[in-house]
Amino acid sequence: MSLYVQKFGGSSVANAEKMLHAAHIIKDTYEADNDVIVVLSAQGDTTDRLLSASREICEEPSLRELDALLSTGEQASVSLCAMALHTLGVPAVSLCAWQVPILTDGEHGGAEISAVGRERVEHELHERRVVLIAGFQGVNENGDVTTLGRGGSDLSAVALSAAFHADRCQIYTDVAGIYTTDPRICPKARRLERISYDDMLLLSQKGAQVLHDKSVALARRCGVMLEVRSCEEGSGGSFVDARGSGDALTGVTKKFCERSVLVGVTAVGQSLPSVEAERACIEALERQDITVYGVEEGEAYLTVFVHRDNADEALCTVHDVLFESRAAS
């Protein structure tokens, strides 16, 4: 019997139909004679709506009370998913982080996980129940709810995978894995079957939205292999591990610069930086009448800065010229 940790993001459980679809995925995993721990985010834009509601009451709410409020979105998700599983005949129990417990430091709004309790979850698994755990949250030494910041549910899933030595850590998103760039913007993006922790960490730090950089860093530190999948796809997906694919070029992403009209378009790969790649990018952008305002180089990456109005076009241009030149070489 294998242990699966499955995390579903907010867009994957945004409404009743999607929640039931996620429940069917969980059911299939459970009925294949596996133990299953599920981590859920708040549905859709629930967190944003809760945050907006708090601002209507108080411009600068207490961080403690804000954490208590925001954590209710995930609590609702796990309860609803447990109900969905019950209707499918699957025994399931929902837990908030304090019931596990997932212990954190005292930092509200961006807490760090310090330990994960095992006894309660192991008992539920022994009773052959699916254990649904609210993501994005923990509890500090005072018994107060804390939240883990952006990407917190990914962090919850990785921490639980490490604590329980899970055989699989599956991250379900609205895309069918990790791509060489955003497939919703660039038609020539292709899915990566495998990527290294180091390359994924760089892509996340430079703007890729699939996985938060803190969760990738924790997975690397704990040796947790990640599997990124889509709820809508029956196969495929991408693995993130220490080995990676060995490809010299991995992906291209973008990140808007704070307090600036510029956006950084970054290519990541072990062949970077290089004079040839920099020249190819600049020349391709110039052919599209896109001005390059600067270049930044670092270990395994190359960034060109363009005006944010050209962000999507520049992303596709840099992606296509680098991957086409690699294919031709």
Where on the chain are the PLM-derived regions?
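A conserved active-site cap/scaffold subdomain adjacent to cofactor or substrate pockets
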Residues: 201-241
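Nucleotide/pyrophosphate-binding catalytic subdomain
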Residues: 1-216, 303-310, 328-329
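A conserved regulatory-domain signal marking ACT and ACT-like small-molecule sensing domains
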Residues: 238-329
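Short hydrophobic alpha-helical runs that function as membrane-insertion/retention elements
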Residues: 168-172, 226-228, 294
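Short gly/pro-enriched beta-turn/loop segments at secondary-structure junctions
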Residues: 164, 221-224, 257-261
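Conserved beta-strand segments of alpha/beta enzyme cores
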Residues: 91-93, 225, 291
